[in-house]
Amino acid sequence: MANEGDVYKCELCGQVVKVLEEGGGTLVCCGEDMVKQ
């Protein structure tokens, strides 16, 4: 579950995202789960 303010990074392409609104599920980029920083 992604919480507001969390930062996630894709280990394949390096894209970084910051969560603005809490929600369920997983963040995915390039077909892989993103890693919480």
From Swiss-Prot:
This is Desulforedoxin. Keywords: Electron transport, Iron, Metal-binding, Transport. Fe cation binds at C10, C13, C29, C30. It holds the Pfam family Desulfoferrod_N. SUPFAM superfamilies: Rubredoxin-like. InterPro entries: Desulfoferrodoxin_N, Desulfoferrodoxin_N_sf, Desulforedoxin. GO terms for molecular function: iron ion binding. Nonheme iron protein possibly involved in electron transport. To the N-terminal section of desulfoferrodoxin. Binds 2 irons ions per subunit via 4 cysteine residues per iron. It comes from the Bacteria. The keyword Ion transport does not apply. Its cofactor is Fe cation. NCBIfam families: desulf_FeS4 (TIGR00319). The lineage of its organism: Bacteria, Pseudomonadati, Thermodesulfobacteriota, Desulfovibrionia, Desulfovibrionales. Homodimer.
